[in-house]
Amino acid sequence: MAGKPKLHYFNGRGRMECIRWLLAAAGVEFEEKFIEQPEDLDKLRNDGSLMFQQVPMVEIDGMKLVQTRAILNYIATKYNLYGKDMKERALIDMYSEGVEDLGEMIMHLPLCPPDQKDAKIAQIKERTTNRYFPAFEKVLKNHGQDYLVGNKLSKADIHLVELLYYVEELDPSLLANFPLLKGLKARVSSLPAVKKFLQPGSQRKPPMDEKNLEEAKRIFRIK
């Protein structure tokens, strides 16, 4: 029997958090090997574990996978969270990419210079309420089903619900005018595996704070 997937990253959200969410939603237990020093990253690079010299990296099924989307797609395929045919996968990919676009803006917010932060937050709020949330709300309204694609849980639902939590951390009022998204969030959050992941003490990571940011900069030698 294969061992648990092993996740190599620093002890923070970053680009690994969506992978943690997807594994957790699939009910898959995983181990984490935290990169705590720059030398830990050097070792992974020097022993050939990182194809492109970067993390996240996930050891799964005898492979050392890098590149976030490749990792997510493998997990989604393995655990039947990637639709039933090519058309469904295309929709799942399209919705996931939209989630990623807004998620990137939120993820990079801690790196924003203080004098630009208010403008960046305003831009995120505008994109959230005028571009991304209306698009996803419309998908759910048009087909009247419980999930985004094929009336079945997919990685697109999980990525979107993860994003909804991040948006709520930024400003809880942004979700107020999107009842179907609120319904999706409640539905996915009540699934036993996700509910467990949302409890305190799980492998879910907290929002990036100043201390966490400085730690990441030190590990990855970011000036």
Swiss-Prot record:
Q: What is its EC number?
A: 2.5.1.18
Q: Where does glutathione bind?
A: Y9, R45, Q54, V55, Q67, T68
Residue ranges annotated for the GST N-terminal domain, each copy included? 3-83
GO CC, sorted alphabetically, is:
cytosol
- The N-acetylalanine modification is found at A2
Q: How does it assemble?
A: Homodimer.
- Name the record gives this protein: Glutathione S-transferase A2
Q: Which gene encodes it?
A: GSTA2
